[in-house]
Amino acid sequence: MSADYPTFKEALEKFKNLESDTAGKDKFNWVFTLENIKSAADVNLASKGLVQLYALQEIDKKINNLTTQVSKLPTTSGSSSAGAIVPAGSNTQGQYKAPPKKGIKRKYPA
């Protein structure tokens, strides 16, 4: 019957391994443990830190999503498509002509 359940030492090792895996996957190097939480102020501080960590992770996900969207934008590879981004310093002459200044009449306040 005892073979169905792990011993205390086996369970302890498993949880230690899980904790080290979590620490290894922690991207922001913020691993929260409940060791030193004794007062209500500690609880508030830890919950504030967890909220900040959650917000940072959400921001990181959004940045990753934006990065994938930006990398999918079309590039100008010889074709002059309407939505393409023009690289800096490229020749854009002939695409837009400013109106002649002779025909513009400005009214200046007296």
Swiss-Prot record:
Biased composition regions of type Basic residues, renumbered to the chain: 99-110
Residue span of region Disordered: 72-110
Domain of life of the source: Viruses
Skewed-composition ranges (Polar residues): 72-82
Protein name according to UniProt: Protein P2
Any Pfam family: RTBV_P12
